[in-house]
Amino acid sequence: MIYVVPDLLEEIFLGLPLKSILRFKTVSKQWRSILESKSFAERRLNVEKKEKILAVGDRTELGFEGEEEIQMVYLHCDIDATRPSLTCEGLVCIPAPGWINVLNPSTRQLRRFPCSPNHHVPSDRIRFQFRDELYLTSFPGNWEMGFGRDKFNGSYKVVRMCFSPVEKCEVLDVETGEWSELNPPPNDIDVGRKSVCVNGSIYWLKNV
């Protein structure tokens, strides 16, 4: 096999469609390492032009019409996936009872992390009725969730906070899969509101 320097390989890979990238991961350890690296993921996110729609459920029942400018990514999940999800730089965080799921729609890679050992908060859930199905409108256990990228070390992190009946704040490092505990903020967060990550900081609306 002709040797090609890694930098040149990365430039070639950037111009390939997703199906080719997924297939080329199996060619060699070197190629897989390049295609799964942070730098490649960031560069591909910047050059990606097509809009993506993440569809959760049974592919045969989805009613989207195909368009050249839209790329569909299908994720087969149970009803827990209908709860609110969080996004950051192309990644999707889907909390579920007992688990934190982080999905990369571009590569179809899904990582699952168990909740921290200290997860013992009662899980009363807010629900609403829609087409004879119960859909969750808050995160598991009424935790307030946040998802973003640490601007200091570049790792993606999931933050969750609870204010009743106990006050807790926990952070999951997606790189290591480890949980850490922090002091909760002085003010309650508005239940049901999603967070947003801007320049490495996560923001919520607070109760007044």
From Swiss-Prot:
SUPFAM superfamilies hit by this protein: F-box domain
Boundaries of every F-box domain copy: 1-44
Kelch repeat start-end pairs: 149-200
InterPro entries membership: F-box-like_dom_sf, F-box_dom, SCF_F-box_component
Domain of life: Eukaryota
Keywords: Kelch repeat
Protein name from the UniProt record: F-box/kelch-repeat protein At2g43270
Source species: Arabidopsis thaliana
